[in-house]
């Protein structure tokens, strides 16, 4: 074969193939042996919970987790400080320049992802955990339907969009509790679409916004109690997470009010009363979850496991 055009095309193809394989390779290290005694992770998301509102909030369950766990109110968003791109970074361990989700409501990459996993989506924490343990039981329930396009739903055992509706989040809480009790998933998430709505409707830190926080805390308390009833509590790490904060009635820009949000870890193997004193970005979440389970992470991820939270 001596056709220069064909030869150049083949060279480009093989160069791309080698790059793709390298990007989707995994990284392992001695520290990634998992946290002893942990069988479950329960991740609870509060869309739009701003870091600067937590101290004044009536949230006894979350504050008890902070007092007995590791926490920061200054976990930084990626830019823009909007929802889909930040939740994508939570799941995918990188920023939008790599996963490609770059707008508030992105359901697919706004420009091509730098790498794709076996299910045709940038590798998520659900992808990684399924590869680590093909028999793992995972669950994702969410009030905002865009999550279903961000999680790699082919790698999730069960996922469902449950709108807030008139139940004001009682429906998703009850469904999540039922799944926990019946299936005892190793990794699961319940993502509330609040207090983001109150922020947009009345303003971040407004009276209506602050009134919503104890309601959400009560749902979190119900979930914690459910893990006790299911016999999961003693070997569960809880994660409380948000995607962004807000200012006035919006977010998406570059103020710290919009970019800083809480991240809390509570459970066995987690330091107690530890204020995380290292920089944390939204995309550090997925590598930390992988670290807890001892799973290898894709080489393409750029976040890091927050080693400082572990005892």
Predicted segments with their positions:
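Beta-strand elements within well-structured catalytic alpha/beta cores of enzymes
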Residues: 37-50, 65, 90, 129, ...
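Metal-dependent active-site segment of extracytoplasmic phospho-/sulfohydrolases and closely related
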Residues: 43, 61, 215-255, 289
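Substrate-binding rim/cap in mid-to-C-terminal beta-strand-loop elements of soluble/periplasmic
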Residues: 91, 254-296, 307
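C-terminal motif of bacterial Sec signal peptides marking the signal peptidase cleavage site
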Residues: 27-28
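Active-site nucleophile/metal-coordination loop of metallo-enzymes that catalyze phosphate/sulfate
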Residues: 34-38, 50-131
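Bacterial N-terminal signal peptides that target proteins for export
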Residues: 3-17
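Second-shell loop/turn segments in exported
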Residues: 48-53, 76-77, 110-117, 127-128, ...
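Active-site His/acidic residue clusters
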Residues: 145-160, 174-218, 222
């Amino acid at each position: 074969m001596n056709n220069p055009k064909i030869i150049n095309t083949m060279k480009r193809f093989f160069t791309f193939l080698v790059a793709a394989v390298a990007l989707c390779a995994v990284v392992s290290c001695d520290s990634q042996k998992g946290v002893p005694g942990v069988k479950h992770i329960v991740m609870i998301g509060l869309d739009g919970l701003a870091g600067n509102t937590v101290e004044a909030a009536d949230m006894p369950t979350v504050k008890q987790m902070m007092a007995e766990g590791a926490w920061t109110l200054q976990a930084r968003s990626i830019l823009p400080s909007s929802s889909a791109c930040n939740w994508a970074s939570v799941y995918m361990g990188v920023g939008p320049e790599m996963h490609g989700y770059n707008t508030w409501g992105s359901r697919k990459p706004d420009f091509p992802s730098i790498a794709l996993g076996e299910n045709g989506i940038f590798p998520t924490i659900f992808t990684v955990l399924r590869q680590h343990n093909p028999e793992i039981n995972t669950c994702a329930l969410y009030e905002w339907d865009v999550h279903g396009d961000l999680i790699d739903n082919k790698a999730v055992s069960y996922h469902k969009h449950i709108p807030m509706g008139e139940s004001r989040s009682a429906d998703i809480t009850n469904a999540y509790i039922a799944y926990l009790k019946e299936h005892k998933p190793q990794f699961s998430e319940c993502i509330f679409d609040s207090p983001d709505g109150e922020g947009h409707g009345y303003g971040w830190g407004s009276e209506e916004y602050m009134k919503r926080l104890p309601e959400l805390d009560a749902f979190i308390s119900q979930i914690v109690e459910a893990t006790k009833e299911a016999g999961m509590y003693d070997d569960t790490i809880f994660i409380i997470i948000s995607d962004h904060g807000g200012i006035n009635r919006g977010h998406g820009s570059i103020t710290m009010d919009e970019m800083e949000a809480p991240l809390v870890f509570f459970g066995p193997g987690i330091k107690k009363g530890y204020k995380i004193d290292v920089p944390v970005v939204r995309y550090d979440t997925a590598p930390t979850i992988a670290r807890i389970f001892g799973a290898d992470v894709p080489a393409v991820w750029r976040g890091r496991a927050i080693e400082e939270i572990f005892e």
